[in-house]
Amino acid sequence: MAPSTKAASAKKAVVKGSNGSKALKVRTSTTFRLPKTLKLTRAPKYARKAVPHYQRLDNYKVIVAPIASETAMKKVEDGNTLVFQVDIKANKHQIKQAVKDLYEVDVLAVNTLIRPNGTKKAYVRLTADHDALDIANKIGYI
């Protein structure tokens, strides 16, 4: 009598094991890298502050004053560049946006430096379609 196939496969599963053997992955590094887990976006039930803080730096606070020294005038005439004293906390993006909004000009680049007296100076280079001399006249520091 031949044993039934179902019984034979059950016997084989008991002897061998139904899961089989898993090939182990060889670790080549000594550091264990934790896998990235799901990070859900925050959805707060209520605001933690009753009133949001007012804007710390608006356009009029970013630009303190134009600088009208001889070297600054040379930059205006030769380099199509305006020179401003700006707030110490203002970054290049804020300076660019402030000049764009206040004087209706397109800005090509902004270079900044901290002066020895602790103030920040910004060199604002304008695009070719805007003349720095005209803008300086409009501002009123020539």
Swiss-Prot record:
Pfam families linked: Ribosomal_L23 (PF00276), Ribosomal_L23eN (PF03939)
Residues in the signal sequence: none
GO BP terms: translation
UniProt xrefs under SUPFAM superfamilies: Ribosomal proteins S24e, L23 and L15e
Stored InterPro entries: Nucleotide-bd_a/b_plait_sf, Ribosomal_uL23-like, Ribosomal_uL23/eL15/eS24_sf, Ribosomal_uL23_CS, Ribosomal_uL23_N
One GO location term (cellular component): ribonucleoprotein complex
Top-rank lineage group of the source organism: Eukaryota
GO molecular function, one term: structural constituent of ribosome
Keywords assigned: Ribonucleoprotein, Ribosomal protein, RNA-binding, rRNA-binding
Record field: transmembrane: none
Gene3D superfamilies reported for this sequence: 3.30.70.330
Keyword Ribonucleoprotein applies: yes
Family from the record: Belongs to the universal ribosomal protein uL23 family.
Function per UniProt: This protein binds to a specific region on the 26S rRNA.
Cited HAMAP family: Ribosomal_uL23_A
Name of the protein this chain belongs to: Large ribosomal subunit protein uL23
